[in-house]
Every structure is written in structure tokens, then in C-alpha cells.
A protein has these predicted regions:
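Hydrophobic alpha-helical transmembrane bundles of multi-pass membrane proteins
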Residues: 1-297
Length: 297
């Protein structure tokens, strides 16, 4: 994969294949009770868990006033599969064929990240039950898993051609078009912000808990169905973004590629607990994560 236009093409279209594998297992692959208790493949009747929602004629695909959230999760989890593959694509650039990448993209997008998501997000997941794992906005469930998957591939592929000099000193390979990189990263900022908001659904009634009997007082919830607020996660998103940008600018001595990339890195570093942190904590975590990433590169 060397052509500039080939990367976005395969990134967008790979899930035309992975899609069918992902939705063919409505109850998961059945590797452990923490995923689901049973495994069911290619079942489209009501005998399988939520399988009836996966067909094109279901109410989920149209306006259904009795269901406010299923469509959001349906699209969000597809987006997660897509994101996992896109992270891998950036890591293996110039060293892999499209066919090989397609196989790996289907593997990470259809199988591996879903297992990790079951462990860390499902109420029966062992990471959640035994370790108290908390990852409200996919910091580890998506980005860490995809990064680890990419690292395993790179251990086989090796570095990019020209990355190291004959003496073993690493060379900096900058972006081909800094302007497009800048635009793309700012679009990702906006999309990530929207993802944060979409992950917080106003379905949790705190009226009785606050002693307001007969009064409905809705607040937002995350994937763990714990209360949070759109205001709080917005502040934390912006502060982790700001911390990443600031740290990237300072440590890279004003390099625009690293500055803007560090903004995204700051958000990802703090996303696991951005529904819990104080905004200053989010900023500090974002800064520390960027410093570590820059030193490791």
C-alpha cells in the first residue's frame, strides 16, 4: 500500500467485507461467558439475542418512536470496527499488500476488538468485574488494542524503508502534505467531540434519588449506565485536547505535525476516564501521554 489515494480507499471500503463477519455473530464468538453465554452464527430470527434487529426490514432501520438508542449503538460499534482497522493501516503503510491488509483489517475489526470490548464493557466482563476496568470512551478498548495489534504486525514487517541510517540512527519521516494532515486532524477533533456526546445518552432519571418525587430529572449516562453530564465531558475533552496540543508544541519545538497529532493523542490518553476526571486532571494526563509518545518515537 504505497499510493496516496489507496490508503483512504481501503480504509473506507474494508468493512464491506468485515461487516458481514461482525454481524454474523449476534451473541459473540462464544469464547467465554464474559462475552455471551452462547454462540449463534447467521441467525436472523428472534431466537438469537437481538438478531432480529440486524435485518434490513427491522424497525431499527426506520423511524421507531419506541426505541431511542439502539440505532446509535448499532452505528457506533460499526464505527469502532472501522476505526480499529484504520489505526492499523497507518502503522503498516508502504510495507504490506492490500490483500494482506484486508485479512488483518477483518481480523481486528470483526474479532479481536470485540472480544476486548466484551471484557471491558460488558457487565459480565472479567476486566470489569475483577479489575474494576473503566473505559468510557474507548481509550483502551479500541486504540490500545489496535495499537498492540499493529505492533505485532510491525514486529514481522520491520521499519519503513529509509527510517534508519546505516549507523542505526532513526530518521524523521514527515507528512507528505502537512496541510491535508492539519485539515484531517481537525476533522478528527470534531468527530471525536461528536462521539463523546453520542456516548452520553439522557436516559437516567435522578429525580427520586434527589428527593424530587414526581419530577423527572434526566442526566446523561455512559456505556456503563453511570451518570455523567455533557458539560463535564465537554470540558474534559477540550482540556485533554489543549494539554496534548500544548505538550506537543513544546516538546517538538513547534513542529506542526507533532503539535496537531499530539492534540489527538492527548484526547485518546484521557478518554478512558474523561467522565470522571477534573478538567485539570484531563489536561495533565493528556500532556503526560504526549510526552511519552514523543519520547518513544
Amino acid at each position: 500500500m504505497k499510493n496516496t489515494m489507496l490508503i483512504p480507499l481501503v480504509t473506507v471500503t474494508w468493512f464491506l467485507f468485515g461487516w458481514w463477519i461482525y454481524w454474523a455473530f449476534p451473541t459473540g464468538p462464544g469464547l467465554a461467558p464474559s462475552i455471551m453465554n452462547e454462540s449463534a452464527a447467521l441467525i436472523t430470527d428472534e431466537s438469537a439475542f437481538s438478531a432480529k434487529w440486524y435485518v434490513a426490514t427491522s424497525d431499527l432501520m426506520a423511524v421507531n418512536l419506541g426505541d431511542h438508542i439502539s440505532g446509535v449503538f448499532w452505528a457506533a460499534f460499526l464505527l469502532f470496527s472501522w476505526t480499529a482497522a484504520s489505526i492499523v493501516s497507518g502503522a503498516v503503510i508502504e510495507r504490506i499488500t492490500v490483500f494482506a491488509f484486508g485479512i488483518l483489517a477483518i481480523a481486528i475489526g470483526s474479532v479481536f476488538w470485540t472480544i476486548d470490548a466484551a471484557w471491558g464493557w460488558h457487565f459480565d466482563g472479567w476486566m470489569l468485574k475483577l479489575l474494576g476496568y473503566h473505559d468510557a470512551y474507548a481509550s483502551g478498548v479500541i486504540h490500545a488494542v489496535a495499537g498492540g495489534f499493529a505492533l505485532g504486525i510491525l514486529a514481522v514487517l520491520g521499519p519503513r524503508i529509509g527510517k534508519f541510517s546505516s549507523s542505526g540512527e532513526p530518521r524523521n519521516i514527515g507528512p507528505r502534505n502537512p496541510w491535508l494532515v492539519t485539515i484531517g486532524l481537525f476533522l478528527i477533533y470534531t468527530g471525536f467531540w461528536g462521539f463523546y456526546a453520542a456516548c452520553n445518552i439522557p436516559i437516567f432519571d435522578l429525580g427520586p434519588e434527589y428527593g424530587m418525587e414526581g419530577v423527572t430529572y434526566f442526566t446523561a449516562t455512559n456505556i456503563y449506565v453511570t451518570p455523567t453530564t455533557l458539560s463535564g465531558i465537554t470540558f474534559n475533552f477540550l482540556m485533554s485536547l489543549s494539554g496534548g496540543l500544548l505538550a506537543g508544541y513544546v516538546i517538538s519545538k513547534g513542529d506542526p505535525f507533532w503539535t496537531y497529532s499530539s492534540g489527538l493523542a492527548g484526547v485518546i490518553c484521557a478518554s478512558a476516564g474523561n467522565d470522571l476526571y477534573h478538567p485539570i486532571q484531563s489536561m495533565i494526563i493528556g500532556m503526560i501521554g504526549v510526552v511519552v509518545a514523543y519520547k518513544l518515537h
